[in-house]
Swiss-Prot record:
The protein's role, per its UniProt record: Casein kinases are operationally defined by their preferential utilization of acidic proteins such as caseins as substrates. Phosphorylates MON1, inhibiting the guanine nucleotide exchange factor activity of the MON1-CCZ1 complex, possibly by preventing its recruitment to membranes by small GTPase RAB5 homologs.
Taxonomic lineage from the root: Eukaryota, Fungi, Dikarya, Ascomycota, Saccharomycotina
Note: Present with 1320 molecules/cell in log phase SD medium.
Entry remark concerning the domains of this protein: The YXXZ (Tyr-Xaa-Xaa-Zaa, where Zaa is a hydrophobic residue) motif mediates the targeting to the lysosomal compartments.
Topology of this chain in the membrane: Lipid-anchor
Annotated protein name in UniProt: Casein kinase I homolog 3
Family of this protein: Belongs to the protein kinase superfamily. CK1 Ser/Thr protein kinase family. Casein kinase I subfamily.
Chief localization: membrane
Amino acid sequence: MSQRSSQHIVGIHYAVGPKIGEGSFGVIFEGENILHSCQAQTGSKRDSSIIMANEPVAIKFEPRHSDAPQLRDEFRAYRILNGCVGIPHAYYFGQEGMHNILIIDLLGPSLEDLFEWCGRKFSVKTTCMVAKQMIDRVRAIHDHDLIYRDIKPDNFLISQYQRISPEGKVIKSCASSSNNDPNLIYMVDFGMAKQYRDPRTKQHIPYRERKSLSGTARYMSINTHFGREQSRRDDLESLGHVFFYFLRGSLPWQGLKAPNNKLKYEKIGMTKQKLNPDDLLLNNAIPYQFATYLKYARSLKFDEDPDYDYLISLMDDALRLNDLKDDGHYDWMDLNGGKGWNIKINRRANLHGYGNPNPRVNGNTARNNVNTNSKTRNTTPVATPKQQAQNSYNKDNSKSRISSNPQSFTKQQHVLKKIEPNSKYIPETHSNLQRPIKSQSQTYDSISHTQNSPFVPYSSSKANPKRSNNEHNLPNHYTNLANKNINYQSQRNYEQENDAYSDDENDTFCSKIYKYCCCCFCCC
């Protein structure tokens, strides 16, 4: 990143490099600390992790005036989870022009990437070792009074990343906080995280029903499908679905079709409910411990404390009974003749967990919401990353953002009315979609909590049913980037005109409206 102009410097001393992803929040770039060594920005207590000069980082850009800002709450989550193993460090949060930016550790490919590179199936050994790490990460999040609410392979990344030098050589390195373990699994993208209990009193949030959906349909729990308030049990059940996905290559509820999305996701939920976990074992080709895991997660009460050690012991039992050892050797280490994954040979790591769409596009523009017409694709060079992100925001702002003007909300109301009758999932009203304007500030320290933040501790004395309609703070939908146009207007037209929907149940819900986040158009 030599000869950088001042337009490419953010946060005083972070140089913005190439774009590496895009998602529901905006756009992400690779960056570099160019000034001096510094510590993670984690509140009043400085973190022990130090980012060295010339250390690579990931820089997220998000328009400041979005309807549902994500990066501020994501930074709050990183502050809460500061010091936990497998959680990236947040080095900076602030504002640059018309954008919020968040700077965190640069990480490697997601488990979804590695899963594809390994032929869309993990061995029992790799799945057990990965499962133990994933359970540990979720336990750490729960111990800090948060629930994740969007468990999926895309949001788990390994520590080792690879970069190509100007000379064309592959440079391998690990995140600054990984202790040089290239296969340490990280959790990222806390845009849907929420406090499930008061950090001081440990009082659990109350059980509620008729909640809007949030999460990824392929992996979400049965209770989430039926509109029940999520808690720790739902994160663990979603993990169980991910484990079977790794072992089987797919899940039985993938590929279901229905006349509309409401019926499709109800059908997915009913299929999950009807199938016994033992039916997922492929005639005992999969160790029974995975069925035991899923049964246990589904048997938990709403506010019950899970036994994480028991769940990890199930994975150890599966290894032992199959004469396998947890030796740290994963399937992806055998790629390319035992040399492991390589950024030049394998598809470039797409950093799912940072929020960008799965790049596996099969040409179905209606389903994937991606305009692949070469005549309309924008290939004009962009001067700076910030201008690129701003152009994306301006395009999407004029086409698909929810307007606060009731007169311009007619089409959105039409979409909501289409799925509302006799629905177990009650969409929010237009009045509940409006978020109060938050004061803008230059640094995080002056940002105060608002009622809409999922990180406001629950207080029983102020419990209000109306608040439950507004307690989610989920990603916005505005990522038309320079080289990929995502046309949400055509998606809405498709939903209204087409009588058969795709089988892409790996969609992430925004609980405010029945509309896709752009990070969810993943092929099945």
